[in-house]
Amino acid sequence: MALNLRKNHQILKVINNALIDLPTPPNISTWWNFGSLLGICLISQIVTGLLLAMHYTADTNLAFSSVAHMCRDVQFGWLIRNLHANGASFFFICIYLHIGRGLYYGSYLNKETWNIGVILLLTLMATAFVGYVLPWGQMSFWGATVITNLFSAIPYIGQTLVEWAWGGFSVDNPTLTRFFALHFLLPFLIVGLTLVHLTFLHETGSNNPLGIPSDCDKIPFHPYYTVKDILGFVLMLSLLVSLALFSPNLLGDPENFTPANPLVTPPHIKPEWYFLFAYAILRSIPNKLGGVLALAASILVLFLTPLLHTSKFRSMTFRPLSQILFWALVANVLVLTWVGSQPVEHPFIIIGQLASLSYFTIILVLFPLAAILENKLLKL
């Protein structure tokens, strides 16, 4: 009898066990599609990024012009650039939905998978930040100046650290060249972390909407979920291509069409939309170090979610109080995103402070208390 190559070849059997014969719960919903969508985002970003890097020049005098040249003179350069810029937005949409799914259905109880996932989020944020600096427009320059300056809030070593990161006494040519090097390198770190993330996931198997073990009732990943994933790919790529072709600058800042000028500060410095919620938390604290700590805590708080799980249920499917809190948290993050895009003046300051307070209160206090109350009400 001929050996089945797919199951016996050293490399093919790894792929087979991860993508073809993988035992999968039969009831996972479309919320479980976002992991594979993130994989597609990563591949498309690396491919478009590589093509852009072939034409980009990491020099303060030439960076802006090289991007303009790409859009004017390179075959489909405008399309590659628009796909790359908007692909970043889709990457963040998918990762936020993926994290939201994890919080709702208790996927964070796979602790290793969850912790690697949070590290992936931090790496993605770093990659997007250094990438935004590369076109060397006004918002690129001032965004880099403001965000790197936050490190100066670290006691004793802060100022030295910032000047070390800048490679001088301000954001200049050395900063741009090292940011380009980092922007090229970090996606490959993300690929490596993704493989670790998947390895830990396949140790325990996927969670499911009911939050109960499904070991007794699994189906193969292929053809059921391969087809389902391909549908997700088609829908997401259709949306990405539509945005890149019809409204490529919708999510960008018009300020970035002006070349960087250290002598002119834009009236309102703000990051890309996917960082606005964290930016609003940073701004809501009138102390520099306090703001930086709150900014870090807004993401690092995700590491604590497995420790704060007090419910006897894994998923929120049968927990109405926790569901209300979860959707309040979603609304809260949307409010923070909106406030982050507004100028620092009367109504927005207090709204931002209240939203920041409620963000941490919901995650750190109300979620565990609601779960304890539900345990009592359901006599668990």
UniProtKB/Swiss-Prot annotation:
Q: What molecular functions are annotated in GO for this chain?
A: metal ion binding; ubiquinol-cytochrome-c reductase activity
Q: Which Pfam families match?
A: Cytochrom_B_C, Cytochrome_B
Name the cofactor(s).
heme b
Which free-text remark accompanies the cofactor?
Binds 2 heme b groups non-covalently.
Q: Name one GO cellular component term.
A: respiratory chain complex III
Tell me the GO BP annotations in alphabetical order: mitochondrial electron transport, ubiquinol to cytochrome c
Specify the protein's topology with respect to the membrane. Multi-pass membrane protein
InterPro entries of this UniProt entry? Cyt_b/b6_C, Cyt_b/b6_C_sf, Cyt_b/b6_N, Cytb/b6-like_sf, Cytochrome_b, Cytochrome_b_C_euk/bac, Cytochrome_b_N_euk/bac, Di-haem_cyt_TM
Primary location:
mitochondrion
Q: Where, in this chain's numbering, is heme b b562 bound?
A: H84, H183
Q: Which residues are noted in the entry as a ubiquinone-binding?
A: H202
- Entries under PROSITE patterns matching the protein: CYTB_CTER (PS51003), CYTB_NTER (PS51002)
Which UniProt key words apply to this protein? Answer: Electron transport, Heme, Iron, Membrane, Metal-binding, Mitochondrion, Mitochondrion inner membrane, Respiratory chain, Transmembrane, Transmembrane helix, Transport, Ubiquinone
- For the keyword Electron transport, the answer is yes
Q: Which domain of life is it from?
A: Eukaryota
Q: Where does heme b b566 bind?
A: H98, H197
Localization recorded for this chain is:
Mitochondrion inner membrane
Membrane-crossing ranges are 34-54, 78-99, 114-134, 179-199, 227-247, 289-309, 321-341, 348-368
What is the recorded function of this protein according to its Swiss-Prot or TrEMBL entry?
Component of the ubiquinol-cytochrome c reductase complex (complex III or cytochrome b-c1 complex) that is part of the mitochondrial respiratory chain. The b-c1 complex mediates electron transfer from ubiquinol to cytochrome c. Contributes to the generation of a proton gradient across the mitochondrial membrane that is then used for ATP synthesis.
Cite any additional comment in the entry: Heme 1 (or BL or b562) is low-potential and absorbs at about 562 nm, and heme 2 (or BH or b566) is high-potential and absorbs at about 566 nm.
Assigned protein family: Belongs to the cytochrome b family.
Quaternary structure, from the entry: The cytochrome bc1 complex contains 11 subunits: 3 respiratory subunits (MT-CYB, CYC1 and UQCRFS1), 2 core proteins (UQCRC1 and UQCRC2) and 6 low-molecular weight proteins (UQCRH/QCR6, UQCRB/QCR7, UQCRQ/QCR8, UQCR10/QCR9, UQCR11/QCR10 and a cleavage product of UQCRFS1). This cytochrome bc1 complex then forms a dimer.
Recorded protein name is Cytochrome b
Q: Which organism is it from?
A: Passer montanus
What gene is this protein a product of?
MT-CYB
